[in-house]
Amino acid sequence: MPEGPEIRRAADNLEAAIKGKPLTDVWFAFPQLKTYQSQLIGQHVTHVETRGKALLTHFSNDLTLYSHNQLYGVWRVVDTGEEPQTTRVLRVKLQTADKTILLYSASDIEMLRPEQLTTHPFLQRVGPDVLDPNLTPEVVKERLLSPRFRNRQFAGLLLDQAFLAGLGNYLRVEILWQVGLTGNHKAKDLNAAQLDALAHALLEIPRFSYATRGQVDENKHHGALFRFKVFHRDGELCERCGGIIEKTTLSSRPFYWCPGCQH
């Protein structure tokens, strides 16, 4: 499943395609959304917001389309008039004069009014987004030490969207390797230096992935600005200590770590 950085890049692509352009056609597959089709013609998308793995597409008439791709949903950008050859089921079409965005296969789609943005069950439950530029390491540290989270093992905590939105398995693996901790650690047991390092890594690694993953710098090892240090690298040598990277299962998800320097 895509994690926060991939969801944010998808949102960027949608914004680049249709933000600020009048909608010339709108179509929804679900009957409960049909009434909004005519209300959105002539309106425009003001911005696309991410809340973890959910997208909020905000329109100029104050309506907001909530969508969560879950495992199978996918957005595509096409030239208006183009019909992609796909076996996926179309759920949403937002068309402008030159570009159209299409949502396929997703089932968790709703239209929200402004007052519903604070009462929607998922949006109420989800924690602050790691890609929100206003989120600071100090706030993350406070959340780590809060009664709700301080006694939780990182194996599960770093996958819990109520703690921080946008984290997922590859980020969990890379963050814990970066700070030399295991999935069995808890915030309440860390010293001040460990806590500070973790609070910074929880923001820096997702943001670095969002900003640079897929970009190439020939001066970097293997050319990649963001690359996995341990994820999917079981059996290889740890670049920090030379130990052998191992694979196990934590919180029902594959977990990669180095026993030599994560303890």
Curated annotation (Swiss-Prot):
Molecular function terms from GO: class I DNA-(apurinic or apyrimidinic site) endonuclease activity; damaged DNA binding; oxidized pyrimidine nucleobase lesion DNA N-glycosylase activity; zinc ion binding
InterPro entries: DNA_glyclase/AP_lyase_DNA-bd, DNA_glyclase_Znf_dom_DNA_BS, EcNei-like_N, Endonuclease-VIII, FPG_cat, MutM-like_N-ter, Ribosomal_uS13-like_H2TH, Znf_DNA_glyclase/AP_lyase
KW Membrane (keyword) present: no
Catalytic activity: 2'-deoxyribonucleotide-(2'-deoxyribose 5'-phosphate)-2'-deoxyribonucleotide-DNA = a 3'-end 2'-deoxyribonucleotide-(2,3-dehydro-2,3-deoxyribose 5'-phosphate)-DNA + a 5'-end 5'-phospho-2'-deoxyribonucleoside-DNA + H(+)
Active-site residue list: 2 (schiff-base intermediate with dna), 3 (proton donor), 53 (proton donor), 253 (proton donor)
Cofactor: Zn(2+)
Binding site for DNA: 70, 125, 169
Protein family membership: Belongs to the FPG family.
Record protein name field: Endonuclease 8
Organism encoding this protein: Escherichia coli O139:H28 (strain E24377A / ETEC)
